[in-house]
């Protein structure tokens, strides 16, 4: 299966390139960077034995390299337009870029179904993170008082994280609405109580040294429950990325969330 990587110079994109090279059934045919200094990936010491073209223009890459699937790890600013372009060219997409609105996801789903091609957008590709979200969804039925703390490296551009938003969405489906906190609480500093989704509070931490971490903290009379997942290295996401690439061959629609393709 021919694969191209968009955003290959980012930390996640770089790890995806190495993953595609390791997998026997996947072939790296192109990489994309918005301002490349190289014309071929072999100009990078780590990949000096390879012959893979570097593109600056997405449409040009799609037309010349003809990948079966594009993996996109870029930025929220261009994530939607990139995915739209990929699908409109009739190419499958695996997208780890976050920041999509529900309306954008539905628009992309319509394109995928019209073209009859598979695509997957996932806030998190770590299987452990998906299990955390599923456990939290189940717990929310019995513990409606809950807050989320998500922690990421300080270069992450969006807050709260896509994983935190997805977790809140899943819990809301299974949770009696409770507006967390005192009715007359006052923020002495704006934003002190975090963002709010369906009465739940979401707090974002950005610090150097972190990768991707999340706690879902439940409280009830006389007891508490904390569900936590930690990604210490970006390799934790790669099994999910490889699975998603292969899964797009079986799909004729866009799937949102890795949990929807796990058995």
Swiss-Prot record:
Ligand binding ((S)-2,3,4,5-tetrahydrodipicolinate): 153, 162-163
PROSITE patterns assigned to the protein according to its UniProt record, in alphabetical order: DAPB
Enzyme class: oxidoreductase
GO cellular component: cytosol
EC number of the protein: 1.17.1.8
Protein keywords: Amino-acid biosynthesis, Cytoplasm, Diaminopimelate biosynthesis, Lysine biosynthesis, NAD, NADP, Oxidoreductase
CDD domains the UniProt entry points to: DHDPR_N
Catalysed conversion reaction: (S)-2,3,4,5-tetrahydrodipicolinate + NAD(+) + H2O = (2S,4S)-4-hydroxy-2,3,4,5-tetrahydrodipicolinate + NADH + H(+); (S)-2,3,4,5-tetrahydrodipicolinate + NADP(+) + H2O = (2S,4S)-4-hydroxy-2,3,4,5-tetrahydrodipicolinate + NADPH + H(+)
Molecular function in Gene Ontology: 4-hydroxy-tetrahydrodipicolinate reductase; NAD binding; NADP binding; oxidoreductase activity, acting on CH or CH2 groups, NAD or NADP as acceptor
The keyword Signal belongs to this UniProt entry's keyword annotation: no
Coarse class of the protein's main subcellular location: cytoplasm
Binding site for NAD(+): 7-12, 96-98, 122-125
GO biological process, alphabetically ordered: diaminopimelate biosynthetic process; lysine biosynthetic process via diaminopimelate
Entry annotation: catalytic residues: 152 (proton donor/acceptor), 156 (proton donor)
Pathway: Amino-acid biosynthesis; L-lysine biosynthesis via DAP pathway; (S)-tetrahydrodipicolinate from L-aspartate: step 4/4
Subcellular location: Cytoplasm
A Pfam family that the UniProt record links to this protein: DapB_N
Superkingdom of the source species: Bacteria
Summary of the function given for this chain in its UniProt record: Catalyzes the conversion of 4-hydroxy-tetrahydrodipicolinate (HTPA) to tetrahydrodipicolinate.
UniProt similarity note: Belongs to the DapB family.
Protein name: 4-hydroxy-tetrahydrodipicolinate reductase
């Amino acid at each position: 299966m021919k694969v191209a990587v968009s955003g290959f110079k980012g930390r996640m994109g770089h790890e995806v390139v190495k993953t595609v090279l390791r997998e026997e059934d996947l072939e790296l045919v192109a990489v994309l960077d918005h301002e490349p200094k190289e014309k071929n990936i072999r100009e990078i010491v780590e990949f000096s034995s390879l012959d893979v073209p570097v593109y600056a223009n997405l449409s040009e890459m799609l037309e010349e390299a003809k990948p079966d699937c594009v993996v996109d790890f870029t930025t929220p600013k261009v994530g939607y337009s990139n995915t739209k372009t990929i699908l409109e060219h009739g190419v499958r997409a695996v997208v780890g870029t976050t920041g999509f609105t529900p309306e954008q996801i539905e628009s992309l789903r319509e394109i995928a179904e019209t073209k009859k091609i598979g695509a997957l957008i996932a806030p998190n590709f770590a299987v452990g993170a998906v299990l955390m979200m599923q456990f939290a969804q189940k717990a929310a039925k019995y513990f409606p008082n809950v807050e989320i703390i998500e922690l990421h490296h300080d270069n992450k551009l969006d807050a709260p994280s896509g994983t935190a938003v997805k977790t809140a969405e899943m819990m809301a489906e299974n949770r009696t609405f409770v507006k967390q906190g005192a009715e007359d609480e006052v923020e002495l500093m704006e934003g002190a109580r975090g963002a709010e989704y369906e009465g739940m509070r979401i707090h974002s931490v950005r610090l150097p040294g972190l990768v991707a971490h999340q706690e879902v903290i439940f409280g009830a009379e006389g007891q508490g429950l904390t569900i936590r997942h930690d990604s210490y290295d970006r390799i934790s996401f790669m099994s999910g990325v490889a699975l998603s690439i292969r899964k797009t061959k079986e799909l004729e629609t866009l799937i949102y969330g890795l949990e929807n393709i796990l058995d």
